Every structure is written in structure tokens, then in C-alpha cells.
Amino acid sequence: GFTPRGLVEMTLNLQALVNDLGADKVELHLIGHSAGSLINGHLIRLLWARHLPIATSTLMAPACTLDFANRTYRSVIEGGGLQRDDFHMHIMSDKREQDDNVIGVYHKSLLYLVSRSYEELQRMPLLGMAKSLDGAYQDFSDPKLSEWNIAAQDMTTQWNAFFWDNDVPAGFAATGSGLTHPRASTLHIYNDPKMTYGPHTKADTSHGGFDNDLNVMTTTLKNILGLDADARLDQPFIDLDY
């Protein structure tokens, strides 16, 4: 199988660091945006194979397939290398996905383009698409009407049974509303039409904007620090318009 040599070297260096400082002095926090979910998926599995637990994992608009997520994130979480409550995702609502564009040529989000054109299966469910996680879009009884390719049924069913603990909610994908507070505390669905990059800078919500948004990055840092959602950071993000 695929062996990401650079990530192997990174893992070995992290293992050496933990051995030098002591496991109680090192916390591993992973953050991945878009295709970064692929890098982190390989990395998280390599880390746990060497018994290095991950304190938190945060994905923003992850572009990996549900099959990949099953083989990496799910495998590590079920194996004890990462707690489910410390696995966070920031994604767009389906309304925002459909309002997004790719360089003004493709008039939906990058994830829609990848799902429908660039994967092994056309209409491949991707981890960062709200519809992939919504029970209302998991009816595979009629291949012509199904949201996803019929060949993706098993990966979709398996991931959602795991992710939702066998109780898959339905009807939230469009705007993100309808999830209970515990569920929305790890699946952060962005439905605001604008993202805030700085004190005087807003931009249309987009696939590429998550790591520029003050709210997303603040929430991510609070999760890493173990702070409550309403806590204030001593040194808050002020301007991420870069």
C-alpha cells in the first residue's frame, strides 16, 4: 500500500520527542484543511501504530472520501488513539456549498466538483459535505435517485453508524439547524453567508476560507486548550486576512 515517507519521518521524530520529554509533557493536536484531511489521515494512523495518542483532531472542509475516513480516522478512534469527542469538523452547510464557486467557472463548491468529477466514483460522498452525514441523503434503493453512487453505500453506512453512534440524524444538511447541542459541539456547520477574516474584513463563505475565519480558528484553539465555548482567549485572534 501507499507509504507516505515524509509522514513516516515526521512520526519517528515525534516519537523521539515524546521519548525524550516524556508522554505527560507532549500533546499532539492535528489540524487539516481540505486535502489536509488526507495528510492527517495517514499521519494519525502512523502515530497510533506507534502508540502515540492524539489529543485533538480538527478538520476543516475535509476533502477525503468516507472510505478513506473509515480506514483512518474511524480506525484510530475505535482503537483508542483519539477520543470521539475530540474529533472536530468544520464544514459548510449544503446551502453554502451550492452558493460557493471554483474560480468563477464551476458554480458550486470545490467539494462538489471533486465528488462529481475527480473521484473514482462519480457522486462520491466526501467527509466535508453535510449531505454525506445526513440520513435524509442515504437512501440507496434507487440508483437513479440516490444522492450518492450506489457503490458508495457501504462506506456511507459504516461511517455514519460510527460517527452518529447508530442514530443518524436527518434534515440538517441544508442549513445546519436541527442538530442537538452535543452533536453540534463536534460537527460545526457554517451557514453564515459571510466569514470574518479581521476587524474590518468579511468575505463570502467559501471552501478556502475556513482557516481565515476568526470564529473557526478561535473555536479550534479553544478545543485544543480545553476551554468552554464561551471562554475568552487571553490572546485572541485579531486579523487572519492574509
Predicted segment positions?
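Gly/Ala-rich beta-loop-alpha elbow adjacent to hydrolase catalytic centers
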Residues: 31-36, 40
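Lipolytic serine-hydrolase domain surface
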Residues: 1-27, 46-240
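Short, hydrophobic alpha-helix immediately C-terminal to the catalytic nucleophile
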Residues: 41-45
